[in-house]
Regions:
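Binuclear metal-dependent hydrolase catalytic cores
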Residues: 1-175, 180, 185-187, 244-266
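Cap/insert and terminal regions of metallo-dependent hydrolase folds
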Residues: 180-264
Length: 266
């Protein structure tokens, strides 16, 4: 399984990166052809991310889009994907791409496009409202949502799949989406190989039940006993040194910062 960071900037696209978007790929057996191929899912598709995604995978080859929640900085570019799937080259032959997300997902897509209430997007998207306690398969990968602590319905995402160097071995990643520190997010992240954690605030910017600062993100990594932490969703005006200093108050393990184009083999 491989993670490619498409966008990592918090709350908006920034001068060095699109907003939140993460490509996760793994090799598996195609149930239709019986042959092996690469399966591709994207977690979130924030502003500016669709064009950057295109440099890593053709939108026609995308197997699934998973939305952690429906704030615009995590899903604004979904309308670009919708336009491609409807009007792009060979679109008439494309099956609807799997779309997993909160209950309000399709309504939010309509709002972004300015579409009428009867627009279903059923030709472009096969939508599933994710349910806590359920799991969802995308090729050899399994997605499990965990309740996040955020002002809207939001999920942290536990994703498991085959290791890059040994497909018989399973590896795991947890993406927090947007959340404050809470027990359900700790549960979802427990023991994962990679924790992709938002750090939307610094300690002097914090509002409750919205984002984590570095201390709380570091606490998450420690309490969940993860192997490796990648900090993301940092505001474009926030110095990474400040974030690292806060994280290190609670986490002494491996720490990296997500950057657009960064690749991580699991």
């Amino acid at each position: 399984m491989k993670l490619t960071v498409i966008g990592a900037t918090g709350s908006m696209s920034g001068p060095e990166s699109p907003a939140s978007s993460y490509l996760i790929q793994a090799r598996g057996i195609d149930p239709q052809s019986g042959g092996e191929r690469v399966f591709s899912l994207v977690c979130d598709l924030g502003p500016g991310s669709f064009g950057a995604l295109w440099t890593h995978v053709c939108p026609c080859e995308l197997d699934a889009l998973v939305l952690s929640h429906c704030h615009a900085d995590h899903m604004g570019d979904i309308i670009s994907l919708q336009v491609y799937r409807k009007w792009g080259p060979g679109s008439c032959a494309l099956r609807p791409v799997s779309l997993f997300g909160p209950e309000e997902t399709i309504r939010r897509v309509r709002q972004i496009e300015g579409a009428t209430d009867d627009e279903s997007y059923e030709a472009e998207f096969a939508f599933t409202h994710m349910q806590l306690g359920e799991s969802y398969a995308v090729g050899p990968m399994t997605i499990r949502p965990f309740r996040a602590l955020h002002p809207v319905e939001a999920f942290g995402l536990h994703i498991e799949g085959p290791a890059e160097d040994d497909p018989s071995r399973r590896v795991s990643l947890f993406y927090t989406g947007d959340t404050d520190l809470c027990d359900t997010i700790i549960e979802g992240a427990r023991g994962v190989d990679v924790l992709l954690s938002e750090v939307g605030f610094t300690s002097d910017e914090t509002e409750p039940d919205m984002h984590m600062d570095g201390l709380r993100a570091g606490t998450l990594a420690t309490r969940a006993a993860v192997e490796r932490m990648i900090a993301t969703h940092i505001q474009p005006w926030t110095p990474r040194e400040r974030v690292a200093s806060e994280i290190r108050q609670a986490w002494q393990g491996p720490l990296e910062f997500a950057t657009s184009g960064m690749e991580v083999s699991l």
